[in-house]
Amino acid sequence: MERSFDALFSQASLFFLAAVRVFALMFTVPLLSVRSVSRVVRVALAGLIAFLVLPLAYPAPMQVREFSAYYVLLLLGEGLLGILTGFFISVIFTTFSAAGQFFSYQMGFGTSEMYDTFAQIENPLMGQFLNFVAMLVFLQIKGFQILFLGGVLRSFQAVNCFVFLRKQEALLLFFTKALSALFLHAMTIALPIMGALLLIHVSMGLLTKAAPQMNLLSEGLPLTIVVTFVLLSVILPYMINLFVSILFGGFEMFEQLLVKLGKAL
């Protein structure tokens, strides 16, 4: 243990580089970026992860002069890498919030919003519900272990901050594909409920046109709400597998980006 701490003090500059990237990731990744998680916990966790990945992230000793302009640029680049990684993880979870937004208005919850503590924005109620389910799935599949123990280490081994200056087109294409996949997955989640609600609205419109005295429009809002919750209770157990595939698909997409950027080193 003493040797480990001696090695840490001898490579303090590299340790701070690793800690800055992990610390920036902590402040942007869902679940850990919320205000309920204290900064002390995030700093301690970032330091622990940086200490664990340091021998594997920098197997060969590097001589970097502290407090030089080059070292400051390295710190800024590592912070940018952590922020972009956390932003991509946030994009994955935005898929589930967007899916809830697609059918919230149709079911009558268009104006019912609540504060999303994860994204720190106002989010429709159903989007918040699906996002919460996705968080539980993320914890169930050991997403934190995959992200912080595997993903962080692979990012250190594959990418440094100067790669972004040489691979801007690859990054732009990657985030474009990620946003396209976000919309596609959100539509896949919301489409069954949107289709059922569309049939209900069309049926009520035809019945109201055929028999105006029935006044079905006054009963339409409770009916759509009840049908939506019944459909969610039926299809949600089957959608868990889709949630898992979306999360793992996002991790695989990010790993492919690291491999592609690693070739530029």
Swiss-Prot record:
One GO CC annotation: plasma membrane
Membrane-crossing residue ranges in chain numbering: 14-34, 44-64, 73-93, 132-152, 182-202, 229-249
GO biological process, one term: protein targeting
NCBIfam families: fliR
Protein family: Belongs to the FliR/MopE/SpaR family.
Topology with respect to the bilayer: Multi-pass membrane protein
Entry function: Role in flagellar biosynthesis.
Top-level division of the source organism's lineage: Bacteria
Name of this protein: Flagellar biosynthetic protein FliR
Keyword presence, Signal: no
Keywords assigned by UniProt, alphabetized: Bacterial flagellum, Cell membrane, Membrane, Transmembrane, Transmembrane helix
Subcellular location: Cell membrane; Bacterial flagellum basal body
InterPro entries referenced in this protein's UniProt entry, alphabetically: FliR (IPR006303), T3SS_IM_R (IPR002010)
Species: Treponema pallidum (strain Nichols)
Gene designation: fliR
Pfam families: Bac_export_1
